[in-house]
Every structure is written in structure tokens, then in C-alpha cells.
Amino acid sequence: MTGLDDLRRDYRVAFLQYLPRRSEAALSRGYEIGRAAVIEGVSILELARIHHEVLLEALRETPAEELTQVATAASEFFLEVLATFDMAQRGFLDGR
């Protein structure tokens, strides 16, 4: 299994744990996944691709009346994952 396979697996687990309850613990796990991705040098585009794949899997099993809630939760989770990328970019730009 590759690093990206591990990342995809961990992302899927955390995302699917976040969807039903939107718990702070699952959201925190999303942040940690983003942090690990930055440390491991995963590109933001690769992370977006993983998010997209996992979201599409979830949407296939989502009843029509819940699509808006799932899309909203997915956005919240993805923003938390991307928070570390934002901090790293700001740190880089501030260091110029």
C-alpha cells in the first residue's frame, strides 16, 4: 500500500465518521490528516482529488433529501483538512 492509499483510507474513515454527527473529534481528525499531508509533501491537488472521490462515494449512497446536508458537511470537513495548507502558505508568504 502506498502513502496515498493510506491517506485515501484515513480520509474516507474520518469523513464518513464526520458525516452523521459532525463531531468535533472527527473534524479534528480531518485537520490532522491535512497536517500529515503537508508534512508528507502531498499536493493540494492530490488531496482535492481524494476528497472528490470520497465525496462521490458518499453521495451515491445518500438519499436525495439529504444531499444538501452531506454537501455542506463535506465542505466543512474539507476546509478543516485544508487549514494546514493555508497556514503553511501564509507562513511562506510572510517569510518573504
Language-model features: locations:
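Non-catalytic regulatory/interaction regions at protein termini and inter-domain linkers
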Residues: M1-G95
